């Protein structure tokens, strides 16, 4: 079990390690049902931190904590950080039975949270005695140590964060002047205005925004200017850093989805990226040589490169399916894979979606050219394929019918359902005419 726990601490193979560790814990619990479940106290202790947890190996931004850091911190608290308080808490949960929320449990959780925060501050503070680095290494990996101070700050400020949560609307479709003023008022709490806690408070606001990039409007409001230098000089300048980080992560996720051929979320992610890039570019006065400008340019370039390479491949994929062959080159039993047709149709739709957001994402020229070429090629080829159904070798006709079906599918994406229905009827008429001609002869 300890090896899997170490793997979680290091962030290695977290999916497999979490699953196997969970199964091992079940076996341990079944072997001694009288012992309180070791993960219940930890879950209760860190429940208030859950909105800020980040999974996976993506780089962390201000306002986030690694989920994999919680287990080592809890084990350290049990072992040496606050063993008496943690032991009392486990015993209390054992007496309570189910550990369900109650005033008694909540009071015990709050007491342990404050004790945990105090223990973390002692080991990380400048007054920590002895070999500080060795003591910190006993808590966990460098990533865990990096998360210690934020964890302590969040545990200590739980009441202030709960109050902020209660004052914020559950969802903010718009983030205009009145909403910005309301959010600013809710955030105006001294304990939340520290450099360590403010990013977490801003994250709570972001989670309620329909367009999370709009969090930069709080920074612009506080600076009373859209000038980058003035915005960066305020504590709320971190909101821009957070927005840029999230856009960068979304761009990386989009690139990974495209490489895997997963297009289900591409339209939504492209819209989010388009709106975010445009929002930061238009609502902030960014200098050409600034760090924020370079980050934004890098995000646009990453999106552009990922999209352009995929867009360039689409016409070739379409031609491989619709290319007309001589009857002698069509083998008996030749077929077109339905999965290939579905994939190419999704790619054509992908190009159409890219066209909507092309100008802001620096892919305008390639997208418009590719889409125009696809329209011209599919229109001409579909008409030619329909005509080919009127004659030719009967043995090749099933393959040509499959080509026409694929072409009609592509027409629906490019020209709409009405045009696709028109070409489908034309294909049926061509086949009917050919059958009549064959009977007459």
Give the positions of each predicted feature.
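Beta-rich interaction/scaffold domains
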Residues: 297, 417, 421-438
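TPR/TPR-like (Sel1-like) alpha-helical repeat modules
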Residues: 401-416
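Helix-capping and short linker residues that terminate individual alpha-solenoid repeat units
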Residues: 278, 285, 412-413, 419
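Extended alpha-helical scaffold segments
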Residues: 1-389, 393, 397-398
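TPR/TPR-like alpha-solenoid repeats
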Residues: 280, 377, 381, 407, ...
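Short amphipathic alpha-helical coiled-coil/interface segments
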Residues: 270-273, 404-407, 427
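Structural helix-adjacent loops and short alpha-helical linkers that scaffold large soluble proteins
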Residues: 362-366, 414-422
């Amino acid at each position: 079990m300890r090896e899997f726990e170490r793997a979680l601490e290091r962030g290695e193979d977290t999916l497999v390690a979490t699953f196997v560790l969970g199964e091992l814990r079940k076996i341990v619990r079944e072997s001694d049902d009288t012992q309180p479940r070791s993960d219940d106290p930890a879950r209760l202790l860190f429940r208030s931190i859950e909105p800020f947890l980040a999974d996976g190996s993506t780089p962390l931004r201000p306002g986030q904590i690694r989920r994999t850091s919680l287990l080592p911190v809890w084990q350290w608290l049990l072992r040496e950080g606050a063993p008496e308080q943690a032991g009392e808490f486990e015993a209390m949960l054992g007496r309570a039975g189910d550990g369900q929320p109650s005033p008694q449990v909540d009071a015990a959780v709050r007491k342990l949270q404050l004790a945990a925060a105090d223990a973390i501050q002692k080991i990380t503070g400048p007054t920590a005695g002895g070999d500080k680095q060795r003591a910190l290494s006993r808590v966990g990996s460098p990533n865990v140590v990096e998360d210690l101070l934020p964890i302590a700050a969040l545990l200590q400020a739980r009441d202030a964060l709960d109050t902020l949560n209660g004052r914020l609307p559950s969802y903010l479709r718009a983030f205009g002047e009145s909403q910005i003023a309301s959010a600013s008022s809710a955030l105006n709490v001294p304990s939340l205005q520290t450099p360590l806690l403010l990013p977490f408070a801003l994250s709570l606001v972001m989670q309620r925004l329909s367009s999370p990039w709009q969090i930069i409007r709080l920074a612009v409001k506080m600076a009373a200017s859209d000038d980058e230098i003035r915005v960066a000089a305020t504590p709320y300048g971190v909101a821009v850093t957070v927005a840029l980080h999230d856009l960068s992560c979304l761009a990386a996720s989009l690139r990974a989805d495209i490489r895997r051929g997963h297009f289900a979320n591409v339209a939504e992610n492209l819209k989010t990226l388009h709106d975010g890039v445009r929002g930061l570019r238009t609502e902030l006065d960014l200098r050409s040589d600034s760090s924020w400008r370079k980050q934004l340019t890098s995000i646009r370039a990453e999106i552009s490169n990922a999209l352009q390479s995929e867009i360039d491949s689409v016409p070739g994929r379409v031609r491989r399916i619709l290319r007309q062959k001589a009857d002698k080159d069509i083998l008996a039993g030749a077929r077109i894979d339905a999965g290939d047709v579905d994939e190419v149709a999704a790619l054509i739709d992908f190009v159409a979606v890219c066209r909507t957001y092309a100008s802001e994402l620096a892919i305008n020229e390639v997208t418009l050219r590719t889409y125009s070429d696809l329209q011209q090629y599919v229109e001409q080829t579909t008409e030619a394929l329909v005509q080919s159904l009127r004659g030719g070798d009967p043995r090749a006709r099933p393959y040509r019918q499959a080509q026409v079906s694929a072409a009609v599918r592509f027409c629906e994406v490019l020209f709409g359902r009405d045009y696709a229905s028109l070409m489908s009827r034309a294909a049926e008429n061509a086949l009917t005419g050919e059958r009549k001609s064959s009977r007459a002869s």
